[in-house]
Amino acid sequence: EKGTIEERTEPKKLFPQAQSIISIALAYPTKLKNAPRNTAGNRRGIFSRTSWGEDYHVVLRDRLEKLALFIDSKIDDFECKIMVDTGELSDRAVAERAGIGFSGKNASIITKEFGSFVYLGEMITNIPFVADKPVEDTCGDCRICLDACPTGALVQGGQLNANQCLSFLSQTKVSLADHFKQKLGTRLYGCDTCQLVCPYNKQVDFHLHEEFEPDPEVAKPLLKPMLQKSNREFREKFGHLSGFWRGKNPLQRNAIIALAHFKDDSAVDVLKEVILEDIRPVIRETAIRALGEIQTERARLALDKVSEQVTEAPLIEEIEKALAKYRQGKIS
C-alpha cells in the first residue's frame, strides 16, 4: 500500500489545504451481452467484472477532473488532489465516511442504488463542503458471502485475508499451489463470487457508462490464443483493461490453469510448445502441471517428449510428478 500510516489517515499530510473530501462511485455492468459460448476445443476464461471495458482508473480520473473543472468555475481559488485506487487514501474508507455506502462483510462498499458493483475515487479539496452522513450497515446476521468464498478468505467483520483471496492470487506472478489452482478454475483476473452472491446485488446490472461496456471476446477470451500472442498482440488485445496492470505473465499463467481445469486435450500441442520454447520458469512449470492434469494419452506422450529435451532440474522434477499422475490414474 502506498504512503505512510500518517499519509493514509491524515489528508493534510498529502494536501496541506485539505478541508473536505469528495467521494464518487460509478456503477459498472455485471452481465455480458451476447456472451460467446464455451465449447470443447474452444475453451474460454473470464475476467472479473472490475476489468470489463476501459481501465476504470482512467475513466474515474476523467470524471473527477471534469468535476474539478466545474467546481473551479463556480468557486474562486479552488484546489484539489485527485486519487483513484492507487493513492494513499483508502477509497473504501473515504466512500464509507462520505455516505456512498456501507462496508459489507464481503469487504466491498455496498450502495443502495447499485449494490457493490461500483468503482470508487475521490478528491481532497480546500473547500469546507458540508459533510454527508455515513450509511447504516445492514448486513445484519447474513453471512452468505463468507460461506461462498472459494478459499475462506473473508473473515467475519468485513476483513479479508489477501493471501487466501483468489482476486489477489490471480494477480501474482508466482507458481500457485495446487489447491489454489483448483479453486481458481477459469478465472483469468479477479474473482466476483463474494459480490455475485450478495443479496444487495440481486439483479444488479447497470450499463450507464459507455467506457465500461465490455467486448465479450475480451472479457471472455479464448484460452489457447492467449498463449500464442506476441507481447504487442497481447497488449493490443488486453492492454486497455485494468486487469492488464500486472502484465501478461499472470494472465497467461491463469489461462494455462484454466485449460487444465477443462482437461482440454486440444491444448496439448500449445502447452508442449510453451514448455519447450518459453523462457519463463513459472509459465513452463504451470504448463507441465497442466499436462499432468489433462489425463489423456496425447498429454502423456507430450510429457514423454518434453522430458527428453528439458534440462533444468526443477522442471524435470515437475515432469516426473506429472507423469506419476498417469501411472496412478486412468487415461482417457
Language model features with spans:
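Amphipathic alpha-helical scaffolding segments comprising HEAT/armadillo-like alpha-solenoid repeats
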Residues: 233-238, 264-276, 296-308, 330-332
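Glycine-rich phosphate/pyrophosphate-binding loop
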Residues: 216-248, 253, 257
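Short coil turns that connect the paired helices of HEAT/ARM alpha-solenoid repeats
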Residues: 171, 244-247, 276-282, 305-316
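Auxiliary alpha/beta "docking" domains used to position bulky ligands
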Residues: 1-138, 315
